[in-house]
Amino acid sequence: MTIAIYAGSFDPVTNGHMDVLKGALRLADEVIVAIGVHPGKKPLFTFEERVALIGESSKAILGKDAGRVSVISFDGLVIDAARKHAAQLMVRGLRDGTDLDYEMQMAGMNGTMAPELQTVFLPADPAVRTITATLVRQIASMGGDIKPFVPAAVAAALNTKFKS
């Protein structure tokens, strides 16, 4: 059984993240979405909220394949989380050349520390290439329409966060 790990902050999960998750499910039997927890960062959504939003979004977008997705938290190195959960693949999404430069450096470092873990790059679909969670949060905070950029459950949660 092939297990992939897909790490990020997912604050919030976007249509771009879901595009990468769909691609990862074509490569692996199971995909672990690993939410990085950083003590110095104050996310908009709690870990529990992000787990729920990833779950709801997966059910809505992936259908029966949502059962092949699990969500964990990790602090420290993603390679340690990958080893703990017996992942063989680390999935990374690429939006542009800037992402590629950074991700190649990370893949090189991770490959040195964990040669058994293969990094796989998935290019973003052009329709979601410009989406970032940071921009989504900014647009939502200013009352803009974020529906084109995030799953429906996330749009509702963002609207609730910024109306209170």
UniProtKB/Swiss-Prot annotation:
Its cofactor is Mg(2+). Pfam families: CTP_transf_like. GO terms for molecular function: ATP binding; pantetheine-phosphate adenylyltransferase activity. Keywords: ATP-binding, Coenzyme A biosynthesis, Cytoplasm, Magnesium, Nucleotide-binding, Nucleotidyltransferase, Transferase. It is found in: Cytoplasm. Its main location: cytoplasm. Pathway: Cofactor biosynthesis; coenzyme A biosynthesis; CoA from (R)-pantothenate: step 4/5. It catalyses: (R)-4'-phosphopantetheine + ATP + H(+) = 3'-dephospho-CoA + diphosphate. Its EC number is 2.7.7.3. ATP binds at residues 9-10, 17, 93-95, 103, 128-134. Belongs to the bacterial CoaD family. Homohexamer. This is Phosphopantetheine adenylyltransferase. It comes from Brucella anthropi (strain ATCC 49188 / DSM 6882 / CCUG 24695 / JCM 21032 / LMG 3331 / NBRC 15819 / NCTC 12168 / Alc 37) (Ochrobactrum anthropi). The gene is coaD.
